[in-house]
Amino acid sequence: MSTSRAGLLAALAGICSGPVWADTSSVTLFGYLNTDIEYVRGLGMGSLWREANNLSFLALKGTEDLGGGWRAFFQIQGNIFLNRGAGNLADRDTYVGIGGPYGQVTMGYQLTPYRASTWLPVDPFFMNTIGGANSIIGNGFFPGGNAQGNFSFDRRQANSVFYTSPTWHGLTLQAMYSLPNEKTASQTPSLFSSALTFRSGAVYLSYAYEQHNSYFGPGTKDTGHRVGASYTYGPFSLRGAAERLRFEPTPATYLTRWAWQLASVYQLASSSFRVSYIQAQAATGNSPTGVGGIGAAGVDSGARQIALGYEYNLSKRTALFAVFSRLMNKSGTAYNYSTNPVAITPTGMTLTGFGIGIGHNF
């Protein structure tokens, strides 16, 4: 048994056998399991059949009533890799926090407000499976610390402090700062991420901003702006997002890229149909090199992705699904599937994938 799995079992055993300190405290075990069988092909890699794990996780969360409208709470969440029998204790959203009349503050390893602003409310595939929007939007997912995965604006961030305001007339403010634990003699990298969201009935609107300081080197600054929207009318929802990323690979060079998404979900009694179209514009600037999937300025560096999905609910917690995705890179770009990327991604590759799977919440 791996150390991480043994540690998880030990933690569960301790919680199950430990004393209950107060009636106002609670601990809950929960999770999500999702896997599918996929056929994927692309120029330069041929084709392959594979089983894919789609962000399955196991988690514990707890809360304690402190009185006066205040509470303390925690979460420990780790990836479970169904297809290869492995897992980790706390490599997903893991934090401890306190909340009250003025909002809540958490500290730990957490998704950024920038990612969360369109993750569930806008993307029909929840930035998961081969249909996920973060193949292009955000320039690929990365979990880690400052200056690591410096290409990504779709992040789970280490050493982070996260504030969520109370909701006022549908408006909620979120802000995160990731401390520069990775500081060196010449570089002090840090991250600031924020989002303002509005929910009222069938309407959702969001604006998010994120800034990476000294990720590529001393004095560099990378920024992301993202807007999102969703409107639901009966069983039909129309969704969209637009994003502007600007990188400074060196203090004297920059690379800017726009991308947008248009998506829809049609919800029936026990099933749903999903569609998403994403387009990345060609990069501009004076950088002679690309960043992540984004190609260098001055080359044919656009891309498109279309994704189709169908989900059938067997119960409130279990669903069967099918997903199709086609990711079309121009000659100067190398975008990849963000969830379960393929190993070979030469510039200009077109990836086509189809999967059938099952998801279960508990």
Regions inferred by a protein language model and the residue ranges of each:
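Transmembrane beta-strands of outer-membrane beta-barrel proteins
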Residues: 27-35, 68, 72-76, 105, ...
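Outer-membrane beta-barrel proteins
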Residues: 40-44, 83-86, 116-119, 184-187, ...
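Structural signature of outer-membrane beta-barrel channels/translocons
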Residues: 61-65, 99-101, 164-169, 197-201, ...
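Transmembrane beta-barrel outer-membrane domains
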Residues: 49-53, 87-89, 154-156, 185-191, ...
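Sec/Tat signal peptide C-region and signal peptidase I cleavage site
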Residues: 18-22
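Outer membrane beta-barrel
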Residues: 23-39, 47-180, 188-190, 196-201
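Outer-membrane beta-barrel "beta-signal"
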Residues: 346-362
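Detector for outer-membrane/organellar transmembrane beta-barrel domains
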Residues: 192-313, 324-326
